[in-house]
């Protein structure tokens, strides 16, 4: 079953990839290190482990894995790679016992970027899970006159409770 799930996920991923290309938008996962300059970060705060909404997991931290996924976290690599075998194995694990290990994410401006666990997120999104258990590190931006940054006050926020 896991091979069929992978091939189905790839079909979804490639459809999304081509839709993005046709619209002229970036077809891969957003990469946090391309979005922010570390010099714009005041500090990082560990928020520990919590359930986070998968709909707010929007990208990855580094560019290394991004081209394996369409921007909806579905895989786009053909079957027969080490990546596809690991994805299929995670799919079996999810069906048989559930994925139990926390992923690791950075939270920035109420969105989450995966540091460890991109394939787990992909599998969970494929199976339409609502949340994922994650170790969360918040990146707190330096004070800025940018209205997008000013609207988010990080001094008192906990994890978003938007489920």
What are the residue ranges of the model-derived segments?
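Short, charged/polar connector segments at secondary-structure boundaries
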Residues: 1-109, 115-119, 125-126
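A short, polar/proline- and glycine-enriched secondary-structure boundary/capping micro-motif
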Residues: 124-127, 145-146
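Ligand-binding loop in jelly-roll beta-barrel domains
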Residues: 129-131
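Long, charge-dense
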Residues: 134-149
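Acidic, proline/serine/threonine- and glycine-rich low-complexity intrinsically disordered segments
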Residues: 151-153
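Conserved small/polar residues in nucleotide/adenosyl-binding loops
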Residues: 155-161
């Amino acid at each position: 079953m896991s091979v069929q799930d992978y091939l189905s996920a790839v079909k979804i991923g490639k459809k999304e990839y081509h839709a993005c290309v046709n619209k002229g938008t970036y077809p891969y996962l957003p990469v946090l290190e391309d979005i922010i300059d570390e010099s714009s970060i005041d500090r990082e705060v560990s928020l520990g482990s919590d359930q986070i909404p998968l709909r707010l997991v929007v990208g990855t931290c580094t560019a290394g894995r991004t081209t394996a996924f369409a921007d909806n976290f579905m895989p786009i690599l053909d079957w027969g790679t080490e990546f596809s075998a690991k994805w299929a194995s995670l799919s079996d694990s999810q069906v048989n016992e559930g994925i139990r290990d926390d992923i690791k994410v950075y939270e920035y401006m109420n969105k989450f970027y995966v540091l460890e666990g991109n394939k787990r997120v992909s599998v969970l999104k494929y199976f339409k899970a609502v949340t994922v258990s994650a170790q969360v590190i918040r990146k707190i931006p330096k004070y800025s006159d940018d209205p997008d940054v000013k609207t988010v006050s990080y001094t008192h926020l906990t994890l978003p409770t938007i489920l």
